């Protein structure tokens, strides 16, 4: 085995044909960086964006793909509190720690963020180097396969639910498009918080799975109007919160499904990013609309603590 190289999934040019598993230089950690031996790495939609278009993100090819991973520490800088062989999961963004947003504790808005698999080499490799502060230790008995799929979907869901105006026990949430990993994570966390959950999908199979996980009701939007069914399920009032990642095609029905003073949180726009605003509905009913991306390091630590207690799993 050559100690200077490793196997990695490397994007050399756009498109599926430009992605291959090949030998690639093994990273040499900087003084403030630790090295992770990757055991498991999750697949996400962003991998497709980066492969096919680059999504307008500043980066250079070749690029090792992958935005989340768990494994064991292969190198730890002195004073980091990490130890070689320790299980750990990675916070996906290297952040500056100096800008106004980092000083406020919100690394998602860092002015100099460098995200794995986007701005810098990612996790589809045998090893990855990241700042030691991005390593979150895991218990010795942690399931690394489950942990490897925790960062993107569940942290995104965590901030959507508990970020700007947290979901409370007894409230009702509408989760749009229950087929995605983020949506399923939202369902798990919402139920854990003591909320009622209604889900939508075009697939009866996905709805059935969500009901088995604990959703109160499922709406197949191919067969019925979402807002009408939501109103029927909530005594004509609407839900307290809508969790959106679809965008244009579902936006109008999502707004119509909210109660007066309700809030909508969006983390994506898979069907288009320019929906009708329906501003009259927004201001008359005093609706709140929030954008949400990823989660902070503090939120990540809270999520991992729940995972370590067995309270959540992908």
Regions found by a protein language model. Give the residues of each.
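NAD(P)H dinucleotide-binding glycine-rich loop of Rossmann-like/cofactor-binding domains
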Residues: 94-177
